[in-house]
């Protein structure tokens, strides 16, 4: 052992790693062993070096000093320590010399020095196999990196791939290693490290830190496996939790505090809605006003029935059910029979209703019963005896557990091995990320099918939800203003131009108290939906909007660059024709794809990853057909224009670009110049211009008559509709319908197509 300069013990040292061979750890493990001193102060000091790159004093380190050091950016520093812990230990070859200059790398570790106090300034090395190569030399003057050393001693260090490492350019190494004095005195204790991490990160932040780091090193399989193994080493002590201890009986005050905490925690998880605020306040008041009722409800087994005589229980339950639709509460007007979690509510006039709460949700039933208590309410006590404050003793509890074991299900061959194996993939899948909002409100989904770009546009969404209205809303001035039921109990229908959406309001006999159902049809992203809900409050007395559910998605795509567009509807066994709509419908796995003219499709019912998979399975057979003629340059041009403008290309824009491309090809010019212009934004457009919009409100700027003339052109004193052959018709599709009188020009076009597509297309064009 030697005592280098004191600078080594104040800051963490970043070392270059030249040898990434897997045998490095084996060379050390075969020859020597390091003592596992699990002192908390040393573990805190190691964590500080990994997070802050500096020591807190070794054995004098404590949690207060660590809190003060991490206070500026606790999440950033802790995540840096987590990433280094995931990379694992690195045994760094070293030669330590004493003050007289004698090398210590060739000697065994002094057993007496290993038992010294960890606070002294001595570096503990671990003996191993002989090593020759790049390594570290520590002398009384400092530390040096040498490309050629001979040693069999190793330092305990930690790998690091941080971009914030103060690495020198002349090192030219991929990885680094972090070393501090405490690492030479003890091994890393994963359990203590996880406890320190939990002090600054939640479990969700810890999982997110791990997932983002693993995705960054996904290409290196060995490194990813090492990170996953160290991740489960940090969580290893959680696989076999300690058995629960028998809790002694608590006093009535402590029991009431525990029960009240459970109710308040459940109420705190409710959605933050204005309509639930009075109910929250009433529950908090009744926790203090009715302690005996709370104790009786908590002592009642869940299989027993609760009887109440209170007003307003039905309204409270309907309000909470709308706010939390995933917790289903069944309501009956007749006795449903023996079911657990039942509540019988008797209101004025002798009206009785039975409520059956979901299993293992006793706190839900207790909370709603407590909310109904008031001056005139009364809780009918059950026949179950109230437990005493003392409770059963430990011998009675053990006998009860043994008796319950007699009737437990017997072991089978599948469950005979204990403890059950833990499947690591079930806890965490780094490659999967759930993005429900981004998938539900994605305006454009781009994918590549065998190198062919396709953009899928979200046409519209049908959203169902409930709203609670202000009872002081507008009154009807006359009897004639009262809305009449029209279609499917729709009493009102609103159409809004900006943002474009429609709202249908359904009939409800208690719209102010229990809410009414609405149906919203909207297209756009999540911000457009929030904007639409804000506009809804301008013409309706909306007090609360309850959780929504998207009932249907409609998406549209165009196969840009497919020259023979009739291929999508010909010669397919999975396509049948509809009678009332001009489209061919392909149905697979319960979802329909309607193919219109000019290779345009509409998909319903699916979104997100399901939509991408459905489009891929539908378009792959078409694009891989031997008869398909694909123009990848056109596909790149139109995909670029669609991606830049986040909208489908309309008829006039489509025909202009098609003719521009064919003119360049006809003149034997560089057709990729059109692609470069598209990428430069020269063909960008707005959905609000008259030639692209479908909204009459926007077309009315120039007048209705001019709006109708937009999709038509004057050809030989005759009006011709541009979209007659389809909005997405390409040059090959509309070529046969133009230039009937100019035979010379048409023959030149046919020769051009034969030159670009092949001689087999000449006969095909003459037939058309």
From Swiss-Prot:
Biased composition (Basic and acidic residues): 104-119
InterPro entries the UniProt entry points to: Herpes_UL87_C
Pfam families: Herpes_UL87 (PF03043)
Top-rank taxon, per record: Viruses
Region annotation (Disordered) ranges: 102-125
Protein family membership: Belongs to the herpesviridae UL87 family.
Protein name (database record): Gene 24 protein
Gene: 24
């Amino acid at each position: 052992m030697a005592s280098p300069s004191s600078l080594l013990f104040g800051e963490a040292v970043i070392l270059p790693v030249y040898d990434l061979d897997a045998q490095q750890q084996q060379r050390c493990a075969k020859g020597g062993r390091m003592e596992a001193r699990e002192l908390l102060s040393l573990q805190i000091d190691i964590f500080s070096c990994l997070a802050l790159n500096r020591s807190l004093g070794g054995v004098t380190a404590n949690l207060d000093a660590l809190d003060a050091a991490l206070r500026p950016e606790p999440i950033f520093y802790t995540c840096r320590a987590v990433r280094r812990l995931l990379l694992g230990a690195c045994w760094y070859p070293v030669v330590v010399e004493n003050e007289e200059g004698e090398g210590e790398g060739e000697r065994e570790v002094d057993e007496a020095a290993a038992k010294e106090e960890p606070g002294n300034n001595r570096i503990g090395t671990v003996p191993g196999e002989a090593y020759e190569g790049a390594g570290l030399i520590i002398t009384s003057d400092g530390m040096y990196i040498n490309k050629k050393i001979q040693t069999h001693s190793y330092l305990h260090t930690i790998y690091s791939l941080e971009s914030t490492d103060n690495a020198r350019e002349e090192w030219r190494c991929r990885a680094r290693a972090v070393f501090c004095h405490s690492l030479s005195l003890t091994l890393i204790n994963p359990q203590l490290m996880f406890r320190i991490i939990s002090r600054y990160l939640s479990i969700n932040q810890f999982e997110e830190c791990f997932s983002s780091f693993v995705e960054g090193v996904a290409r290196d399989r060995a490194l990813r496996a090492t990170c996953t193994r160290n991740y489960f080493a940090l969580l290893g002590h959680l696989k076999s939790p300690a058995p629960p201890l028998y809790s002694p009986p608590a006093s009535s005050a402590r029991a009431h505090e525990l029960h009240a905490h459970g109710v308040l925690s459940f109420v705190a998880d409710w959605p933050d809605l204005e309509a639930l605020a009075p109910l929250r306040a009433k529950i908090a008041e009744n926790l203090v006003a009715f302690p005996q009722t709370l104790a009786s409800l908590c002592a009642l087994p869940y299989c027993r029935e609760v009887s109440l005589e209170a007003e307003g229980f039905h309204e409270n339950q309907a309000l909470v059910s709308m706010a939390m639709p995933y917790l289903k509460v069944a309501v009956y007007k007749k006795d449903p029979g023996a079911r657990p979690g039942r509540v019988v509510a008797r209101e004025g006039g002798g009206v009785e209703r039975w409520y059956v709460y979901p299993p293992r949700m006793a706190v839900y039933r207790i909370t709603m019963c407590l909310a109904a208590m008031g001056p005139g309410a009364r809780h009918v006590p059950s026949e179950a005896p109230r437990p005493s404050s003392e409770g059963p003793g430990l011998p009675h509890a053990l006998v009860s557990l043994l008796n319950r074991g007699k009737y437990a299900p017997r072991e089978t061959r599948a469950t005979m091995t204990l403890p059950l194996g833990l499947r690591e993939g079930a806890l965490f899948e780094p490659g999967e990320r759930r993005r429900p909002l981004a998938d539900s409100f994605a305006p454009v989904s781009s994918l590549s099918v065998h190198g062919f770009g396709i953009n899928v546009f979200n046409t519209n969404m049908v959203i169902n939800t409930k709203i609670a209205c202000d009872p002081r809303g507008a009154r009807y001035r006359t009897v004639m203003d009262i809305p009449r039921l029209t279609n499917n109990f729709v009493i009102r229908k609103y159409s809004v131009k900006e943002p474009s959406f429609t709202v249908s309001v359904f009939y409800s006999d208690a719209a102010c108290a229990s809410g009414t159902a609405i149906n919203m049809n909207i297209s756009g992203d999540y911000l457009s939906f929030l904007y639409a809900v804000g506009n809804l409050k301008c013409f309706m007395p909306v007090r609360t909007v309850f959780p929504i559910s998207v009932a249907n998605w409609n998406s549209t795509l165009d196969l840009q660059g497919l020259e023979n567009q009739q291929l999508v509807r010909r010669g397919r066994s999975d396509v049948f024709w509809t009678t009332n709509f001009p489209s061919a419908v392909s149905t697979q796995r319960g979802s329909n794809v309607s193919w219109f003219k000019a290779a345009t499709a509409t998909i319903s019912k699916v979104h997100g990853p399901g939509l991408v998979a459905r489009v891929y399975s539908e378009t792959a057979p078409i694009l891989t057909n031997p008869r398909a003629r694909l123009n990848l340059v056109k596909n790149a041009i139109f995909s670029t224009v669609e991606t830049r403008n986040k909208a489908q290309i309309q008829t006039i824009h489509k025909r202009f670009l098609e003719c521009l491309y064919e003119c360049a090809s006809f003149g034997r010019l560089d057709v990729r110049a059109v692609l470069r212009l598209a990428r430069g934004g020269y063909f960008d457009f707005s959905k609000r211009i008259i030639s692209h919009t479908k909204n009459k409100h926007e077309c009315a700027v120039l007048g209705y008559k001019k709006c109708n003339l937009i999709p038509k052109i004057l050809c030989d004193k005759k009006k011709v509709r541009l979209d007659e052959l389809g909005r997405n018709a390409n040059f090959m599709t509309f070529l046969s319908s133009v230039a009937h009188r100019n035979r010379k020009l048409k023959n030149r076009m046919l020769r051009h197509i034969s030159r670009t597509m092949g001689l087999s297309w000449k006969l095909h064009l003459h037939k058309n």
